[in-house]
Amino acid sequence: MLEHLSSLPTQMDYKGQKLAEQMFQGIILFSAIVGFIYGYVAEQFGWTVYIVMAGFAFSCLLTLPPWPIYRRHPLKWLPVQDSGTEDKKPGERKIKRHAKNN
């Protein structure tokens, strides 16, 4: 069973994260406004809480899993480069000295 879970994608790109955050905040705000208005009209604070909680659950369902909509812009990594400093011994490296500020 765990083999199936490990094959699921778990990453989002930066634009996908931004979209998920905007959707999350928009759904929460919308449900809070609707919940407040309905709770005020019905004179039941409980309905306000239920509507906001339903909006929260809905927004979590839409934004927490890494749906394909959030992975449209994959990161392009730079190729690995050899750094010349690893081949040198510690005594051969140049030491940078900063000028003293008086």
Swiss-Prot record:
Keyword list, A-Z: Endoplasmic reticulum, Membrane, Transmembrane, Transmembrane helix
Gene Ontology terms: biological process: protein targeting to ER; signal peptide processing
> Residue ranges, Cytoplasmic compartment?
1-19, 70-102
Q: List the disulfide bonds.
A: none
Q: How is it modified after translation?
A: May be phosphorylated.
Q: Where does this polypeptide localize?
A: Endoplasmic reticulum membrane
- Superkingdom classification of source: Eukaryota
Q: Which GO terms describe its cellular component?
A: signal peptidase complex
Main localization, broad class? endoplasmic reticulum
- Pfam families assigned to the protein according to its UniProt record, in alphabetical order: SPC12
| Segments on the Lumenal face | 43-46
Topologically, how does it sit relative to the membrane?
A: Multi-pass membrane protein
Locate the region Disordered: 81-102
* Membrane-crossing segments per the record: 20-42, 47-69
Summarize the protein's role. Component of the signal peptidase complex (SPC) which catalyzes the cleavage of N-terminal signal sequences from nascent proteins as they are translocated into the lumen of the endoplasmic reticulum. Dispensable for SPC enzymatic activity.
Quaternary data: Component of the signal peptidase complex paralog A (SPC-A) composed of a catalytic subunit SEC11A and three accessory subunits SPCS1, SPCS2 and SPCS3. Component of the signal peptidase complex paralog C (SPC-C) composed of a catalytic subunit SEC11C and three accessory subunits SPCS1, SPCS2 and SPCS3. Within the complex, interacts with SPCS2 and SPCS3. The complex induces a local thinning of the ER membrane which is used to measure the length of the signal peptide (SP) h-region of protein substrates. This ensures the selectivity of the complex towards h-regions shorter than 18-20 amino acids.
Family of this protein:
Belongs to the SPCS1 family.
Name-wise, this protein is: Signal peptidase complex subunit 1
State the organism of origin: Sus scrofa (Pig)
Gene name for this UniProt entry: SPCS1
